[in-house]
Each structure stands twice: as C-alpha cells, then as structure tokens.
From Swiss-Prot:
Taxon lineage: Bacteria, Bacillati, Bacillota, Bacilli, Lactobacillales
Name assigned to this protein: ATP synthase subunit alpha
SUPFAM superfamilies: C-terminal domain of alpha and beta subunits of F1 ATP synthase, N-terminal domain of alpha and beta subunits of F1 ATP synthase, P-loop containing nucleoside triphosphate hydrolases
Enzyme class: translocase
Origin species: Lactobacillus helveticus (strain DPC 4571)
Entries under InterPro entries matching the protein: ATP_synth_asu-like_sf, ATP_synth_asu_C, ATP_synth_asu_C_sf, ATP_synth_F1_a_nt-bd_dom, ATP_synth_F1_asu, ATPase_a/bsu_AS, ATPase_F1/V1/A1_a/bsu_N, ATPase_F1/V1/A1_a/bsu_N_sf
Presence of keyword Transport: yes
Quaternary assembly: F-type ATPases have 2 components, CF(1) - the catalytic core - and CF(0) - the membrane proton channel. CF(1) has five subunits: alpha(3), beta(3), gamma(1), delta(1), epsilon(1). CF(0) has three main subunits: a(1), b(2) and c(9-12). The alpha and beta chains form an alternating ring which encloses part of the gamma chain. CF(1) is attached to CF(0) by a central stalk formed by the gamma and epsilon chains, while a peripheral stalk is formed by the delta and b chains.
Positions bound to ATP: G169, D170, R171, K172, T173, G174, K175, T176
EC number: 7.1.2.2
Main localisation: membrane
C-alpha cells in the first residue's frame, strides 16, 4: 500500500493542529509514617492546606500540617492497609461530598456513603466540605420564625430561620431530645433537616432514626453519622460534610435546619489529631485554632438575601458541659460564636421540669425579631415572671407569712412552670401555644389546681379544635391575636365547664 506525499503532509498538519503542549505533572510523595488516623509524607512540596491527597491503595487524606520537611495528613476512613513507603499524590482539589435530593431519607457517613443498607445513592452533584461563609451583603436579617413546637423555646428563646442557637447542658439533660423534637415539628413546614451525629453510640443513633421514621420525619431529613469507633478524622469532618449538604438546599432558596450533636466530641477529635500531628497544645490541651474550627463552621449558617434566593440554614449546635460549667473553654467559645443559647439544667431535669430549660441563663439574641406578633404579646412578661418566681420561691422556704401579692406571684409562677412542661416527642403548633399562654397570662389558670394544669391544657385544645377552630386559624394564618373579647369568652366558657380532679 502506497502513501502519497500530500497525504503525509496533511496528516502531519492534522497532528500539529491537535497537539497539546501541556504536560501532565503529578506531584507524588512517599509515606514516612502512618498510625492513629494520621500519616506523614515526604516530597509533596507544593501541597496546599486542606488539599485532598490520594494514597496508592485508593484511600484519601487531607493535608493538615505543611512542614518544611514533610506534610502531616489526616486519613479519611480506615488506615490499616496504608504502609510506610507507599506513594501518595496530590489531587489539586479539596474534599467534596455528594449533595441533593437523593440524600433525603438516608443515613450516610461523613464521606456521603450510605450506611443504612438501602443501596447506593445516585447523586451527580458534589460540594466541597469547606466553603466560604456568605458575606455581610449576601445576608439579610433573621425575620421568619423556625417553630420548634416546644412552648418553653418558642415563648422564651425564640429561634429564627438562619439563626445559630446553641443547646448546652450536662449529659442526660435532654439536649438531643430537644433537637429531635424540633426536627419532628418541621413536618409540613417546608424545611429540610440534617441531623449530624458526632461520636454518638450506634445504638443511640439507631433509636433516633427509628423515632424520625415513626413520626414520618425521615421524609425530609438526612442523617450524617460518625460513630465513636470511627477514626478521629471522620468525627472532625462530619459537621462540615453535613453543612455542605445543607448549603446545596440553602443556595437553591430552601430553608434548612442542621443539628450538630455534639460539637464537644468534634473538638476532642480535633485535639487528638492536633496532638498526633505535634501541634503545640494550648488551654485544656486544645490547639490554638480550636475557636476557628467552630467559627468557620457556624458562620456558614445564614439567612440569604433575596438576590441569592432567600434560602436559610439554621444551626442548632449542641455542647456538653461538665457539672454545669459553662465557663469552660469550648462552651465559652461556642457561646460567643452563636446567636444565643438554651441552657439545660440537671437540677430542673431531675426535679421533673422537662424540658429543663433554665430561663435565666438562656437567651436568643435575634429570634425575637422573628417571633409572631401573637406570641410576642402573650409571652412578653413570661421571662421576668419566671425569674421573679424563682427568686421568691427561695425566700418562701423560710417563712409562711406571705402577703397576698407575693402569694399570687408564687401561685402564678407554679402554674407557669407547669404550663411550660412538655412530654417527649409531642410538639405543639404555635397557635395552640399562644392559646394556653394567653389563658395563663390572663389569669384563667390561677384557680386551677397545679396537678390539673396538663389536663386543662389538653381539654382546652380539644375544645378549641371542635368549637373554635376559626380562632386558631386566625392566629395560624395572620400571626396576630384574634378579637380579645371572643378569645376571652371562649376560654371563660371552657373554664367554667372544666371539672378539677377530686382529691
């Protein structure tokens, strides 16, 4: 077969046209040490902080320490099959996780891989776990309430969409229950929820997932789980992975609620990694940048401006205290980053006041702007009344000769405490919360025995559902109190027919 000269020249021209003079250079290093979830590698001179690195066996790691002689790497997942002398190469990108609707209703690990046995997650979109927080001009003020369904929170420490509200307290004071109940209350509220379990026992997470399924909440919830048996890097990246999943919905104009349960365990995992990487320890052996660990995470929660779609990401970080000490390092850090805190007290919890919210130490710095007008009106004096009651209660123990005004305050205080109690997994719609608080603040409960308050509330709700649904509808749809005379007459009519329990 003969080839003509002009064919050769046209082939050469064709090759020259498509010639790419770019060289494909991969920077490769060698592992010099591996153990306890970290590795050191020599030869990655141009690696960037936070860059994703790939090991020979297919495992991934994140460049954490950039020293002159080597790079400190935190290994994602199991590190048993990585050996000294293995090769590790740069990827030129930071770690990403799958995002989108395909994750809703699933339980995943911090890498976005399913752990619920329900098969593969088909998602073609990913987002980097580290993202710059929205700037000042990209945000708008919090102006829409996020109803938790918990009377003590919606009345005393209201939360708005786009807020960061810390839940803080000792172990076994109901922190997780508060967060789970808030997720349950988002049913039919068009809010996507993400529950990030960091270092929680597998059995505990299983129980929470079963609860969410039982109440139909998994239809709008993603669970990200990093168990205590996982290597420390997985616990460290879990909140960032959860936030990346939430940001995808936020930037598409949706409202998202994310719960971090809990950030104390993430801080401990980060301390472990930092000490293994030989970073200098600071207060309580935490590294110097532990504040930045949480601030860069929580600053990503925001209410976006209308120009960016008006979506929101509301964060409920949880912090565990030791013996009620909220002045420890991590609690004070997170208190200063968030827009308020809900403080749960073990004394109240064991005394039967549940949720055990300490009204004196709990505050919401921006949620008040988002509260509906009806709730603002009925709950206005509730906090001061409760604080006055707690003060009087301690004095009343010393003597029985109390004047009428003091006795009236004590009676009202006892009923306030009773009204704010609420059973587990029983969120109450905001219109019914307004109703019972209206009855309380207008004195309709003053003559009801304390032990009958709970029954009075339930029967009042049933009565209004059947006979005065229009009044509840007005509160729900307008956010304002209905006509004072009508509401008072309806409550009065029910109060007269209510029969207290016989002693």
């Amino acid at each position: 077969m003969s080839i003509k000269a002009e064919e050769i020249s046209s082939l050469i021209k064709q090759q020259l046209e498509h010639y790419d003079d770019k060289l494909d250079i991969n920077e490769v290093g060698v592992v010099t040490y591996v153990g306890d979830g970290i590795a050191r590698a020599h030869g990655l001179n141009n690696a960037l902080a936070g860059e994703l690195l790939k090991f020979d066996n297919g495992s991934y790691g994140i460049a954490q320490n950039l020293d002159s002689s080597d790079v400190g790497i935190i290994i994602l997942g199991q590190f048993d099959n990585i050996r000294e002398g293995d090769r590790v190469q740069r990827t030129g990108r930071i770690m990403s996780v799958p995002v989108g609707d395909a994750l809703i209703g699933r339980v995943v690990n911090p890498l976005g891989q399913p752990v619920d046995g329900l098969g593969e997650i088909k998602s073609d979109k990913t987002r980097p776990i580290e993202e710059k927080a929205p700037g000042v001009m990209d945000r708008q003020s919090v102006n829409q309430p996020l109803q938790t369904g918990i009377k003590a929170i919606d009345a005393l420490v209201p939360i708005g969409r786009g807020q960061r509200e810390l839940i803080i307290g000792d172990r076994k004071t109901g922190k997780t229950s508060l967060a789970i109940d808030t997720i349950l209350n988002q049913k039919n509220q068009d809010v996507i929820c993400i529950y990030v379990a960091i270092g929680q026992k597998e059995s505990t997470v299983r129980t929470q997932v079963e609860t969410l399924k039982r109440f139909g909440a998994m239809d709008y919830t993603i669970v990200v789980e990093a168990g205590p048996s996982e290597p420390a890097p997985m616990l460290y990246i879990a909140p960032y992975a959860g936030t990346a999943m939430g940001e995808e919905f936020m930037y598409n104009g949706k409202d998202v609620l994310i719960v971090f349960d809990d950030l104390s365990k993430q801080a401990v995992a980060y301390r472990e990694l930092s000490l293994l990487l030989r970073r200098p320890p600071g207060r309580e052996a935490y590294p110097g940048d532990v504040f930045y660990l949480h601030s860069r995470l929580l600053e990503r929660s925001a209410k976006l401006s209308d120009k960016l779609g008006g979506g929101s990401l509301t964060a409920l970080p949880i912090i565990q205290t030791e013996a009620g000490d909220i002045s420890a390092y991590i609690p004070t850090n997170v208190i200063s980053i968030t827009d308020g805190q809900i403080f749960l007290q073990s004394d109240l919890f064991f005394a039967g006041t549940r949720p055990a919210i300490d009204a004196g130490n709990s505050v919401s710095r921006v949620g008040g702007n988002a509260q509906i007008k009806a709730m603002k009106k009925v709950a206005g004096t509730l906090r001061t009344d409760l604080a006055a009651y707690r003060e009087l209660e301690s004095f009343a123990q010393f003597g029985s000769d109390l004047d009428q005004a003091t006795q009236a305050k004590l009676n009202r205080g006892q009923r306030t405490v009773e009204v704010l109690k609420q059973p587990l997994h029983d969120p109450i719609p905001v219109e019914k919360q307004v109703l019972i608080l209206y009855a309380l603040t207008h004195g309709y409960l003053d003559s009801i025995p304390v032990e009958d308050i709970s029954r009075f509330q339930n029967e009042l709700f049933d009565n209004f559902d059947s006979s005065h649904a229009d009044l509840l509808k007005t509160i729900r749809e307008t956010g304002k109190l209905p006509d004072d005379k009508k509401l008072s007459a309806a409550i009065e009519e029910f109060s007269e027919s209510f029969a207290p329990s016989e002693k």
